[in-house]
Amino acid sequence: PTELLFNAAAEEEYMEDPQETEKIEEALLAQGYFSLAVPMPYEWQDYMRTYCEEYGCPYPLALAVAQTESNFDMDAVGASGEVGIMQLNPGPGSSYHAEIQAATGLDPTTTSGNIAGGCYKLGLYLAKYGNVEKAAMAYNMGEGGARSAWDSGITSTDYSKAVKEAMETWECTVNAWGGV
């Protein structure tokens, strides 16, 4: 007998119902989990909320970095090869991407992996350095560059100020729609 490799009838049972998906999204939007104010698809908002919680990164901080780094553009590529919505630098021989992949279990060049990697780094730096401006500086300059700046008496940069300002705006936006 011939073995079926694909059973279309069985597959239809497990396919998502678009109407059901829409109802779930509407309910999550009504509850404040998703927001029309966030210029990302709901799936990406879900990734960001999930990874923020997992890695100890405030959701408004992750939104602020995504806005500042790429204006929420997953296809963005920076001058030094940074990629994705969170503009993750691959590092020498892709060593930074390897570190992120080892920590998160996800490929940082995919949307979920890029968001996870950014949230991981932000949560790590926030826990390590204790405030948003220092965490933003380490995220943007690397830890060595940030330490060098701090040793020279520089405690903030235009980038860290922009992130902090955007974070404060996102905090107001998030609180306004109950999406804490």
Regions found by a protein language model. Give the residues of each.
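A short, structured beta-strand-centered segment in the mid-to-C-terminal lobe
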Residues: 103-114
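Substrate-binding/active-site groove segments that recognize
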Residues: 79-102, 117-120, 160-163
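Short, functionally critical alpha-helical segments immediately adjacent to catalytic or ligand/cofactor-binding
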Residues: 57-74, 88, 115-119, 135-142
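Short glycine/serine- and small hydrophobic-enriched flexible loop segments
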Residues: 50, 67, 90, 120-127
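Short, solvent-exposed loop/turn and secondary-structure capping segments
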Residues: 75-78, 149
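N-terminal secretion targeting segments of exported proteins
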Residues: 1-6, 19
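Catalytic and substrate-binding regions of cell-wall glycan-acting enzymes that process beta-1,4-linked
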Residues: 127-180
